[in-house]
């Protein structure tokens, strides 16, 4: 008798589990609207991080290019000083070359302190990650509902990724 009772309970439990799985895999309009909103926000964050990357790239180049030019010129000047600078002007030329070297060092130190290259790269990586989230959501929503991943599973994945990106992305 208890075996029959256990079989009935097991069947009932299996039916309830199947209904619950079906309920969790069904897509509702609210879920689609929520995901569409997340996709739109992801697209906005991608754009904002792209703008920040461009800003930091420009700032990084404004430090890097002058340092490269000054270092190249002072290196060449040091090498050519004996050949082209008359003896009476050598001290002045050496002081000028040394001053330019010091200026290049100061600019390089400021560049390292301001971390423009790191900020540029972190915004680039964040923009790519936000773009990926947007693309994943848009692709899933473009599919017919029966061909999509289970709704609850996909929402949980997207929520976790959205939260991770919010926490790990650099400030804009």
Model-derived features: positions:
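Conserved non-transmembrane functional hotspots
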Residues: 2-69, 80, 93, 99, ...
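Juxtamembrane "helix exit" motif at the C-terminal ends of alpha-helical transmembrane segments
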Residues: 70-87
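Short, surface-exposed helix-loop/turn micro-motifs enriched in polar/charged residues
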Residues: 64, 87-88
């Amino acid at each position: 008798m208890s075996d029959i009772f256990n079989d009935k309970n097991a069947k009932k439990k299996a039916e309830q589990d199947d209904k619950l799985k079906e309920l969790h895999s069904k897509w509702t309009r609210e879920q689609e609207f929520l995901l569409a909103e997340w996709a739109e926000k992801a697209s906005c964050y991608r754009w904002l991080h792209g703008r920040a990357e461009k800003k930091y790239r420009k700032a990084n180049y404004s430090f890097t290019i002058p340092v490269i030019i000054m270092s190249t010129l002072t290196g060449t000047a040091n090498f050519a000083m004996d050949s082209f600078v008359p003896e009476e002007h050598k001290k002045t030329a050496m002081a000028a070359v040394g001053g330019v070297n010091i200026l290049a060092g100061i600019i390089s130190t400021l560049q390292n302190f301001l971390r423009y290259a790191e900020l540029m790269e972190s915004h680039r990586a964040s923009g790519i990650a936000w773009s990926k989230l947007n693309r994943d959501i848009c692709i899933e929503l473009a599919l017919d509902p029966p061909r999509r991943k289970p709704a609850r599973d996909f929402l949980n994945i997207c929520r976790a990724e959205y939260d991770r990106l919010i926490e790990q992305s650099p400030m804009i």
